[in-house]
Amino acid sequence: MIHALNGKVESIENGKVYVNVNDLIYEIIVGDTGDFEEYINRNVKIYTKMVVNDDGISLYGFLEVIKLKLFEKLIGVNKLGPKSALKIISSNSVESVVSAIINEDVKALSSLPGIGPKTAERIVLELKDTIKELDVSINEKDRKVLEAIEALVTLGFNRNQAKKAVNKVAAKDDKLDDIIKKALRFLSR
């Protein structure tokens, strides 16, 4: 098994990142290639999961180990494949997905891309007891930052733009609406 790769990002194409590790180039399927753009021609550590199925052998990759752990949990759900699991992780924060599972919020889960009500119910049923193993505890500032990013995405901004803007303007004691206002000003420049 390959747990992680440390190498230089050669290129990014069609949801895949090509990483050069000692002159061996690995093709890694990633959810949001925008997260990797800043690493082109730079070294990066990517946490990976090798998946063997009818389509062949594939490597799925994440910049954060917590996303890898959530991916592993999700692909363990009956009838939920790696592509669907990747869509779930790419479309929302780990914290909000875990929170929806813990709170048995089938409606929130079924609003995610490619997830219908039956699949959402199956995710809750199969993961509600084990998902708590993921340490996704977040402090108040981080919670506000995540909520501000989600608000900006809802308003139509690209997730990467929203992350960059919120992280740039958020101060420790800011209220959520202040963070959003500052980020909107930053994005309108």
UniProtKB/Swiss-Prot annotation:
Domain of life: Bacteria
Subcellular location field: Cytoplasm
Gene Ontology cellular component list: cytoplasm; Holliday junction helicase complex; Holliday junction resolvase complex
GO BP field: DNA recombination; DNA repair
This protein's UniProt keywords: Cytoplasm, DNA damage, DNA recombination, DNA repair, DNA-binding
Major location (coarse): cytoplasm
GO molecular-function terms, A-Z: ATP binding; four-way junction DNA binding; four-way junction helicase activity
InterPro entries to which the protein is assigned, alphabetical: DNA_helicase_Holl-junc_RuvA_I, Hlx-hairpin-Hlx_DNA-bd_motif, NA-bd_OB-fold, RuvA, RuvA_2-like, RuvA_C, RuvA_C_sf
Annotated segments matching region Domain I: 1-63
Segments for region (Flexible linker): 135-139
A Pfam family this chain is assigned to: RuvA_N
CDD domains, alphabetized: UBA_RuvA_C
Region span, Domain II: 64-135
Sequence segments annotated as region (Domain III): 140-189
SUPFAM superfamilies: DNA helicase RuvA subunit, C-terminal domain (SSF46929), Nucleic acid-binding proteins (SSF50249), RuvA domain 2-like (SSF47781)
Assembly and interaction partners: Homotetramer. Forms an RuvA(8)-RuvB(12)-Holliday junction (HJ) complex. HJ DNA is sandwiched between 2 RuvA tetramers; dsDNA enters through RuvA and exits via RuvB. An RuvB hexamer assembles on each DNA strand where it exits the tetramer. Each RuvB hexamer is contacted by two RuvA subunits (via domain III) on 2 adjacent RuvB subunits; this complex drives branch migration. In the full resolvosome a probable DNA-RuvA(4)-RuvB(12)-RuvC(2) complex forms which resolves the HJ.
Annotated family: Belongs to the RuvA family.
Free-text note regarding domains: Has three domains with a flexible linker between the domains II and III and assumes an 'L' shape. Domain III is highly mobile and contacts RuvB.
Name of the featured protein: Holliday junction branch migration complex subunit RuvA
Species name: Thermosipho africanus (strain TCF52B)
